[in-house]
A protein has these predicted regions:
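Active-site neighborhoods and metal-handling regions in enzymes and metal-associated proteins
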Residues: 1-236
Length: 236
């Protein structure tokens, strides 16, 4: 669900080395292969992901190193140990300037975020309308089938690239389970009573969403009404 590849980037005065699992890309994924070729043509050296420790050791062994900037919040213990043992006098710790700049959204990014939430919100509303009318008509629907239908509504949006995480489609007691995994086989049937929770999101070329809605599918118990109201008041 994460469209950003897990990797390391080492930038020196003369080179840019990208440590990535290039071999994990399926042969039929020509779009990614084309991206690799473009990066190579631009001077980025593609390296094996597992070689980052060795490259870092070789780098700090060089006498020409005067400073090495790292972000401790994204550095694992193994790489930190290499630096701490061999180059502690050169290491400068601080927040990544890349992350800091990305945290401030430009006008295009802000517009994309708004468009994503508007488009995605329409898809979710269409889904909830379908769910309500289908159940009232007597159609049999379970948790997993509901999540599949939501995917169909989202996939009709131009620029849709898939879910931003696995959809949590949970009915009744299942909705009380943190990070409930909706089973493809044997998921709970939905009825015209009680509460239904749907936690989902979409990846679009212009933005990413994460939306949770808990809705009554029909009459609710007094306890469900009280709990629902208290949670709503807490959010407001």
């Amino acid at each position: 669900y994460n469209p950003v590849v897990m990797s390391y980037l080492l930038v020196t005065q003369d080179n840019v080395l990208w440590f990535v699992r290039k071999g994990a890309v399926p042969e039929e994924d020509t779009e990614t292969e084309d991206s690799f070729h473009e990066l190579t043509a631009d001077g980025v050296s593609l390296q094996e992901y597992s070689d980052v420790g060795l490259a870092l050791s070789n780098l700090v062994d060089g006498s020409y190193i005067k400073a090495l900037f790292v972000d401790p919040s994204t550095l694992n213990y193994d790489l930190y140990s290499i630096l701490n043992e061999n180059a502690s006098q050169f290491v400068v710790m601080g927040a990544s300037p890349v992350a800091l700049r990305k945290s401030v959204k430009n006008e295009v990014e802000v517009a994309g975020m708004r468009e994503a939430h508007l488009e995605d919100g329409v898809a979710v509303e269409r889904f909830l309308h379908w769910l309500e009318t289908s159940l009232q008509a007597g159609d049999a629907i379970n948790e997993y089938e509901a999540s599949v239908k939501l995917h169909e509504f989202r996939s009709g949006i131009e620029g849709f690239r898939g879910e931003s995480f696995e959809t949590i489609s949970a009915y009744g007691p299942n909705a009380a389970l943190p990070h409930y995994v909706t089973p493809e086989e044997g998921s709970a049937e939905l009825y015209t009573e009680g509460l239904y929770l749907c936690d989902s999101g979409g990846q679009y070329l212009f933005g990413t969403t994460d939306i949770t809605r808990t809705v009554p599918l029909g009459p609710c118990s007094q306890l469900e009404k009280e709990d629902y109201t208290l949670v709503l008041k807490g959010h407001i």
